[in-house]
């Protein structure tokens, strides 16, 4: 049996941003700092809590129907990346984030280690059909994204996992450089 979970998050497991992940990403949102978004932020993404994914794995154990089959197991809330960031901020009780859109290919060139995934994966729609997992494994998506973020933040706060985003100024540097380049381009085009 093959289980194909997509982005799985939860207590001790990470959230994604286009640049920062995990506690750094959540700290940026909480502080109301601008958030880098790859492309126009309109590609679709799913993020499923690990507890829901675990139930699919349990449903596959000793299940003769599942033998030799493959299953997608992921969220059933299809979020644009823009909405993903907005809902994460909402769950934190933070202000709506200022989203700074930068082309995926440029982000990947600026920091391949952190942003290469924007070009390789995030810029594309990541939606999957869970119907076989629901039918054969008893999978159900029970933890909405906002509730899942709240659970993870509570866990991180209890375990010292919300890192200080001021310790990494890379996202701020990219945002400042991008905004300055855009202003120069507009000024030159207006001549």
Outline where the language-model segments fall.
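Short arginine-rich
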Residues: 156-163
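Short, solvent-exposed loop/turn segments at secondary-structure junctions
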Residues: 7-10, 42-43, 78
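Substrate-positioning beta->alpha
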Residues: 16-25, 38-61, 68-69
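Conserved beta-loop-beta element that borders a ligand/cofactor-binding pocket
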Residues: 1-14
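A structural signal for short, well-ordered beta-strand segments and their strand-loop junctions
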Residues: 1-4, 36-37, 72
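Conserved loop-to-helix N-cap of the C-terminal "lid" that shapes the substrate pocket in Rossmann-like
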Residues: 2, 41-54, 70, 81, ...
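A short C-terminal helix-loop "cap" of Rossmann-like NAD(P)-dependent dehydrogenase/epimerase domains
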Residues: 24-38, 93-100, 131
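Mid/C-terminal beta-alpha module of Rossmann-like enzyme folds, strongest
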Residues: 59-118, 130, 136, 150-151, ...
């Amino acid at each position: 049996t093959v289980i194909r979970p997509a982005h799985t998050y939860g207590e001790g497991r990470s959230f994604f941003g286009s640049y920062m992940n995990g506690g750094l990403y959540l700290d940026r949102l909480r502080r109301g700092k601008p958030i880098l978004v790859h492309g126009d932020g309109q590609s679709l993404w799913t993020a499923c809590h690990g507890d829901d994914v675990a139930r699919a794995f349990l449903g596959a154990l000793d299940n003769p129907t599942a033998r030799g089959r493959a299953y997608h197991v992921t969220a059933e809330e299809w979020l644009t990346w823009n909405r993903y960031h907005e809902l994460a901020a909402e769950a934190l009780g933070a202000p709506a984030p200022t989203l700074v859109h930068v082309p995926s290919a440029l982000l990947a060139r600026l920091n391949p280690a952190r942003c290469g995934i924007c070009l390789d994966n995030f810029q594309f729609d990541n939606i999957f059909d869970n119907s076989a997992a629901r039918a054969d494994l008893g999978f159900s998506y029970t933890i909405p994204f906002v509730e899942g973020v709240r659970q993870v933040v509570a866990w991180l706060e209890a375990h010292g996992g919300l890192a200080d985003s001021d310790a990494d100024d890379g996202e701020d540097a990219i945002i400042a450089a991008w905004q300055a380049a855009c202003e120069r381009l507009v000024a030159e085009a207006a001549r």
